[in-house]
Amino acid sequence: MSTAEFAQLLENSILSPDQNIRLTSETQLKKLSNDNFLQFAGLSSQVLIDENTKLEGRILAALTLKNELVSKDSVKTQQFAQRWITQVSPEAKNQIKTNALTALVSIEPRIANAAAQLIAAIADIELPHGAWPELMKIMVDNTGAEQPENVKRASLLALGYMCESADPQSQALVSSSNNILIAIVQGAQSTETSKAVRLAALNALADSLIFIKNNMEREGERNYLMQVVCEATQAEDIEVQAAAFGCLCKIMSLYYTFMKPYMEQALYALTIATMKSPNDKVASMTVEFWSTICEEEIDIAYELAQFPQSPLQSYNFALSSIKDVVPNLLNLLTRQNEDPEDDDWNVSMSAGACLQLFAQNCGNHILEPVLEFVEQNITADNWRNREAAVMAFGSIMDGPDKVQRTYYVHQALPSILNLMNDQSLQVKETTAWCIGRIADSVAESIDPQQHLPGVVQACLIGLQDHPKVATNCSWTIINLVEQLAEATPSPIYNFYPALVDGLIGAANRIDNEFNARASAFSALTTMVEYATDTVAETSASISTFVMDKLGQTMSVDENQLTLEDAQSLQELQSNILTVLAAVIRKSPSSVEPVADMLMGLFFRLLEKKDSAFIEDDVFYAISALAASLGKGFEKYLETFSPYLLKALNQVDSPVSITAVGFIADISNSLEEDFRRYSDAMMNVLAQMISNPNARRELKPAVLSVFGDIASNIGADFIPYLNDIMALCVAAQNTKPENGTLEALDYQIKVLEAVLDAYVGIVAGLHDKPEALFPYVGTIFQFIAQVAEDPQLYSEDATSRAAVGLIGDIAAMFPDGSIKQFYGQDWVIDYIKRTRSGQLFSQATKDTARWAREQQKRQLSL
């Protein structure tokens, strides 16, 4: 294929008025990428610099190639990187990179922008492998003072993209930090006359800060960088100012420990003054700066509470700033959007979020200035002041001690409830939110006789109001039920009939504007989950409502619906199924007579041509039915199996994870009878976990379900044991793919799933110790890993399972054959820590005591 032909394909795929031509062109491009990536990549880079090709085609060439190098899916990104490394020759790589760098300095900004993204994608693959070593020098040279504006801007943009997409622990970028910093500072300093260059430099700085730790640790370099950023906050251009404050937020987040002198010398006064800026964007960024300070100090306080020996130190910036910052925040609360239906983030919302963080950080110290503001404004003539007062009160419901909050809620609640009848929609919406905050954070302050009837009445009125008010009222009801249901006796059940009637009315809305209908269904789900026998009749009315509602949706002729109406119907069915699943789980004994009818409805829903949207919810409801019926569900398995296998095979879809969870539910329902299906299910699960295209969330889901199956089929799991243990060992030994929080969290999920698997395997083989014996050492190695990782051992459920495993294994081997494992220092220490840990539940401490007894028996053998 020639460059001209390839360019024509690109142009057709985006510019052709004929949809068939567009689709055909896209298909041909994808086919070429799959069949001959070397040619595809080369042609893309040639079109990018071909000035005879239309602008849109050139831009698309860069972006299409970029999208074949990186993906939001980490598995695909690894596959793309391997393809680039193995299928593209060194000569071709050099030519593609040369073409990308040529396009980067184009005077057409859209070409340069696309090239910057392409360069970052290539760098993301090459730099970690030590390739393209000259790139950083090129970037520095491109940002020199003598370079044209367009070259500097585009090169800084590329640097920002590189840093944004890279692994935070990338040694390639850390080792290039000097060059990165030189390039950025050249563009960010006040001597740079171009706004576009300065803005690009500041944005790149925000993305690069994590890689310049070594530079920030050197006082001279840190001082100079802080000077450049502080000067930028005083620029005449609003965008540059806002970007500079964005950098200060990131600097405070990453380098809090160095910030004391800068706060004292400049940042404190600078940010206080700038909070009064008439420009909302700049004021918002300044508020964000103080939010960042609060977040850091909250984290430090938590760290010091958990680990008193930690070297971290809090400078209490927020606490010492209350008298200056909080009054400004309170004033900013009155700068709301004029349009009550405008939900765009604004400076008022930023101030409210910041006030919440100040309350969490400073506790009772926040009360005086806020309550004074509330008292002065809650009955003001201007709706902005009334709304701000209610927002301020709701924002301090988490932080000060409960005695103080309870006292002030008693005083303020009558006035707040009155505002549910306000003429201003904004005031009513925020009032409903404020009541929800009270119910969530300090529900015990709502006196059952004095306040609760008024709160419930306010919610019932709000459910019939504007959708935004109704949504907040549903949330308030959820909080009331969750927080008050545990009381003995609970006052909330007296109001169940009225609340359910109100929610059913809201759930019958014809639309879901501002999520009002869905919120009502969520509240109904909560009502079901917390219902007791005293409100059985009311619970039955929810069951009747959702069954009738589901029947109504099933009778709709979907062929006559517009796309928007069809989506609304699917959304409604999803909401109904969520409540129905809760009803089924809550009343398992009443399910059997209607099980055939329910399964018939579920099969009809799965048969719909566009069932993908609700498939997950249908599976969740069927799981609830399986759990309720127990072994009685087996009669549906033959009919249901094709749907289950279809879902399991959709390894790139969330429904596959739900389907895996369904297997766990089925194995728990059928117990030992699940052995009849274990061969087929284990085969499918093994294929899923080894599929390179599978969603990565599948791995922990599948590992965990192995434990469910093992615990239920017992000795019949032995034929799979060797293969499953190999998978578990591989999983427990894998390292995070990078240093991002997402990657670290995923690794924790995988390790927790391995623990689930081991717990199930040990439980299932309790009568077959000889089968487990070869793997005891492996399991103990894993428990040691848990005992050493604070992210694992600090979790109550995780430590309970791990020490329980130590005890369970000991009980299986009363002959002393595994005695050597129980004398290890870490075993003694871990059991002791778990038994005496203040943060652990009594159940976990009891499990640790039992494990200690089992350990002592082992050592006495």
Curated annotation (Swiss-Prot):
The keyword Phosphoprotein applies. InterPro entries: ARM-like, ARM-type_fold, Armadillo, HEAT_type_2, Importin-beta_N, Importin_beta. It comes from the Eukaryota. HEAT repeats lie at residues 3-35, 37-66, 90-129, 134-164, 177-208, 219-255, 260-306, 317-362, 367-395, 402-442, 452-484, 496-530, 536-586, 592-629, 634-669, 675-713, 718-764, 773-812, 819-859. The modification Phosphoserine is found at residue 836. Keywords: Acetylation, Cytoplasm, mRNA transport, Nuclear pore complex, Nucleus, Phosphoprotein, Protein transport, Repeat, Translocation, Transport. It is found in: Cytoplasm; Nucleus; Nucleus, Nuclear pore complex. Its main location: cytoplasm. GO terms for cellular component: cytoplasm; cytosol; NLS-dependent protein nuclear import complex; nuclear envelope; nuclear pore; nucleus. The modification N-acetylserine is found at residue 2. GO terms for molecular function: disordered domain specific binding; guanyl-nucleotide exchange factor activity; importin-alpha family protein binding; nuclear import signal receptor activity; nuclear localization sequence binding; protein-containing complex binding; small GTPase binding. One of its GO terms (biological process) is phosphatidylcholine biosynthetic process. Residues 25-106 form the Importin N-terminal domain. The keyword rRNA-binding does not apply. Belongs to the importin beta family. Importin beta-1 subfamily. Binds to nucleoporin FxFG but not GLFG repeat regions. Ran-GTP can disrupt the importin alpha/beta heterodimer by binding to the beta subunit and releases both subunits from the docking site. The stoichiometric complex between importin beta and Ran-GTP renders the latter inaccessible to Ran-specific GTPase activating protein (Ran-GAP) thereby inhibiting GTP hydrolysis stimulated by Ran-GAP. Importin beta subunit that functions in nuclear protein import through association with the importin alpha subunit, which binds to the classical nuclear localization signal (cNLS) in cargo substrates. Docking of the importin/substrate complex to the nuclear pore complex (NPC) is mediated by importin beta through binding to nucleoporin FxFG repeats and the complex is subsequently translocated through the pore by an energy requiring, Ran-dependent mechanism. At the nucleoplasmic side of the NPC, GTP-Ran binds to importin beta and the three components separate, leading to release of the cargo. Forms a complex with the importin alpha subunit (SRP1/KAP60). Interacts with Ran (GSP1); interacts specifically with the GTP-bound form of Ran (GTP-Ran), protecting it from GTP hydrolysis and nucleotide exchange. Interacts with nucleoporin NUP1. This is Importin subunit beta-1. It comes from Saccharomyces cerevisiae (strain ATCC 204508 / S288c) (Baker's yeast). The lineage of its organism: Eukaryota, Fungi, Dikarya, Ascomycota, Saccharomycotina.
